[in-house]
């Protein structure tokens, strides 16, 4: 969990690379409040989403699109590949993450069930060092976070430059 202007902030990366160039007004953006810490930031993010997005029959907000990137270890969002598989059924929309392997160690992540409920999920798997994680994710019985997302959804669009 870092402030939105920190170099490790996903919001900072997307804001500078996408939102600012496209002139998307800041009042149209809902960002994770990592600077408030994992529990408080996760609660606030869930409350904000529930105010603007309808829920499915299981109580999960139905987002139009979730765009994920693949980490070198096969993680997506901040869902670690070494988490117990039981986390796939956790109904938390957002939750705190502690001791994540890649800095920063404290994070806020969207939950598997919320990803599963989205109308569309797009995955970007690109770049050096991600080839093995990508192949492991596509293999039957894959153990990566991305493999878990694929098992939860009937369709996920994958954008990649990795030869399969």
Describe each PLM feature range.
Residues 22-23, 86-88, 113-118, 150-154:
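Short, conserved loop/helix-junction motifs that constitute active-site signature segments
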Residues 42-43, 76-82, 133-137:
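A short secondary-structure junction signal
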Residues 117-164:
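ATP/nucleoside-binding phosphotransfer catalytic cores, i.e., glycine-rich phosphate-binding loops
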Residues 1-65:
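Ligand-binding beta-strand-loop-alpha-helix segment within the catalytic cores
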């Amino acid at each position: 969990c870092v402030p939105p202007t920190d170099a490790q902030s996903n919001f900072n990366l997307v804001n500078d690379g996408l939102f600012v160039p496209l002139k998307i007004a800041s009042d149209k953006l809902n960002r994770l409040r990592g600077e408030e810490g994992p529990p408080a930031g996760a609660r606030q993010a869930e409350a904000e989403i529930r105010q603007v997005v309808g829920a499915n029959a299981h109580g999960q907000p139905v987002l139009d699109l979730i765009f994920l990137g693949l980490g070198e270890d096969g993680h997506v969002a901040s869902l670690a590949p070494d988490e117990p598989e039981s986390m796939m059924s956790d109904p938390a929309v957002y939750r705190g993450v502690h001791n994540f392997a890649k800095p920063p160690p404290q994070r806020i992540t969207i939950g598997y069930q919320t990803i599963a409920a989205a109308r569309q999920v797009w995955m970007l798997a690109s770049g050096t060092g991600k080839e093995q994680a990508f192949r492991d994710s596509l293999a039957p019985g894959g153990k990566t976070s991305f493999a878990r997302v694929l098992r939860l959804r009937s369709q996920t669009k994958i954008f990649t430059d990795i030869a399969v």
